[in-house]
Regions:
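Secreted, periplasmic, or luminal enzymes acting at the cell surface/secretory milieu
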Residues: 5-139, 145, 149, 170, ...
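Short, hydrophobic/aromatic beta-strand segments
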Residues: 137-144, 156, 188-191
Length: 202
């Protein structure tokens, strides 16, 4: 079995990913990173991290690939609001690993999703029941995305609106609530120089 350990701060091309038994991403771990990675590899620690970027299938799929070369010291920001996963959603490009992806030594199941009106500080909240269906204790990150189904506005296909992490023993279930505040539904209005919530279905 071959396990690939990545240490870096940005996505890389992984054409050989299918030949790996597993991939562990250490990001930029610092002086304690070696021991932390050993703990994950030996099973002393159950990983629960999620990717902070989208991993493309090919380098040519990266939006800056066409105007960034090894001979240039800078690259122009041409992505508009479509940064990171928003770009891949917009162009419907297949990717190797999605933003927010991550595995564990246990498994989780979701159910009973419900959305309720919010209180003083949020527009609404999303509640979902998460169950640890494996045989090891572990942690899961619940991610809630918003998507506008109608209305006008220059916006991404979907956006991460909130998240929450829960630790569960084997067989344990927990209702996880993620508050969705006004900013999760807002667009910036250049005329008003302020954030505005567009009417419509989300």
């Amino acid at each position: 079995n071959i396990v690939l350990v990545l240490c870096g701060g940005s996505p890389v091309e992984l054409p050989f990913a299918g030949a790996m038994s597993a991939i562990v991403h250490g990001y930029l771990p610092g002086q304690g990173g070696g021991q932390a990675i050993v703990d994950v590899l030996t099973g002393a620690h159950n990983p629960s991290g999620k990717l902070a970027e989208t991993y493309p299938l090919h380098y040519r799929d990266v939006p800056s690939a066409g105007q960034f070369t090894r001979h240039e010291a800078t690259a122009e920001h041409r992505d508009s609001i479509y940064l990171g996963y928003r770009y891949y959603d917009k162009v419907a490009a297949p990717v190797r690993y999605e933003f927010g992806y991550g595995l564990s030594y246990t498994t989780f199941a979701y159910g009973d999703l419900a959305v309720s009106t919010g209180g003083a500080e949020e527009i609404c909240s999303a509640t979902v029941t998460v169950t640890n269906t494996g045989d090891r204790a572990g942690a899961e990150v619940v991610q809630i995305y918003t998507q506008a189904h109608d209305g006008t506005g220059f916006r991404a296909v979907r956006e991460l609106a909130g998240f929450a992490k829960v630790n569960l023993a084997p067989g344990e279930s927990c209702a996880v609530t993620v508050p969705l505040r006004e900013h999760a539904f807002s667009l910036f209005d250049p005329e008003a120089q302020d954030w505005r919530v567009q009417p419509g279905r989300y």
